[in-house]
Amino acid sequence: MANIVVKRLERTPIDEIPVEIVERKGIGHPDSICDGIAESVSVALCKMYKEKMGVVLHHNTDQVELVGGYAYLELGGGCMVSPIYILLSGRATMEVLDKETGKIIKLPVNTTAVNAARDYLKKALRNMDLEKDVVVDCRIGQGSVDLVEVFDRKRTEIPHANDTSFGVGHAPLSTTEKIVLETEKLLNSDALKAEIPAVGEDIKVMGLREGKKITLTIAMAAVDKYVNSCADYVNVKELAKAKVEENAKKYLDGHELEVCINTADDDEDCIFLTVTGTSAEMGDDGSVGRGNRANGLITPFRPMSMEATSGKNPITHIGKIYNILSNIIAEDVAKIEGVRECQIRILSQIGKPVTEPKILDIEMIPENGFELEELSPKAKEVAQKWLDNISEVTERIVSGNVTTF
């Protein structure tokens, strides 16, 4: 049995505190673009390694930088003047010694990485011309000797932690968290883009709850080729606002809602227009790990890890595995009858099996009529089950079935 500790969460339930702030950066935000590319590159490398070598080899591709380009904006359609520059860096296993033949096997790391980055951009930014609007530069290098050695030495056994670090998670999502998350998903959904094509992918949703009132302040890029006048632009905002308000009704749970879109606009002179759907075309830079946490949100009223989850290897890198695992455990613990709220923290120790954390800390707020003592064994059972099946978490990541930002 792992070192699992269960205790009462000594705080007011999140939905009852007077003020709550929640943020989500949409898939077209420069930071989220970097997160998405980093994770897509990692997943592609995992698949390439398994195809070529039968196992996932060591890599960390969590160092993606975006340098903003420059665009000439015009109602009815502008153009890019200077392309967005994206740098792929990090470390990956590029050569493997075949112990049976004694030959060095060279692996197509950089080709795989560039193709994955371009495929992701094509999927995420529908108005970007990949031939003209962006430059993808790959500078991924060979992995650290020490880290590769730890990875290779342990890969046929239980993976061992490559760092002393921690992951955190919480569940269930608060009303504000649900609305912020679902609002961005709505605005970047295929259905909404088909109905309102002028809505770009660079969307940021900031949620503020004061008592029973939730205010959403939304920054929403518009694509200039679909906007022929300022009146068109105002209409796009009004249509999007109506969609957000209608969608939010499913999650409001008695709260009042106010939706504000592009509050910096001066509808005569200053509006949020883009050519490609992202502010990365206008000098906004981006980096991995500066945006959403592993659960897709930025939650200053909850515990958060500063680790960038996207792009890290899914076998031994605690910054990835334990953050994702913490959220999975929290979600399952929160499903136990009598658990109102749950927070998870998992701490590793470098070189130790990932199934044996130094501590797995569970904090819970019981529902009225339930005692911590009766909930504790059930929560421990959930946590131990996931530690025993941690390879399932890795498989979800490698398959691309886990959200990391």
Swiss-Prot record:
Stored InterPro entries: AdoMet_synthase_2_family, AdoMet_synthase_3, S-AdoMet_synthetase_arc
Record-level Gene Ontology MF annotations: ATP binding; magnesium ion binding; methionine adenosyltransferase activity
Residues engaged in binding ATP: G141, Q142, G143, S144, V145, D146
Key word Nucleotide-binding present: yes
Keywords: ATP-binding, Magnesium, Nucleotide-binding, One-carbon metabolism, Transferase
Biological process annotations from GO: one-carbon metabolic process; S-adenosylmethionine biosynthetic process
Reaction equation(s) it catalyzes: L-methionine + ATP + H2O = S-adenosyl-L-methionine + phosphate + diphosphate
EC number: 2.5.1.6
Co-factor requirement: Mg(2+)
UniProt keyword Transport, yes or no: no
Pfam families the record matches: AdoMet_Synthase
Gene3D superfamilies: 3.30.300.10, S-adenosylmethionine synthetase, C-terminal domain
Membership in a protein family: Belongs to the AdoMet synthase 2 family.
Protein name per UniProt: S-adenosylmethionine synthase
Organism from which the protein derives: Methanococcus maripaludis
Name of encoding gene: mat
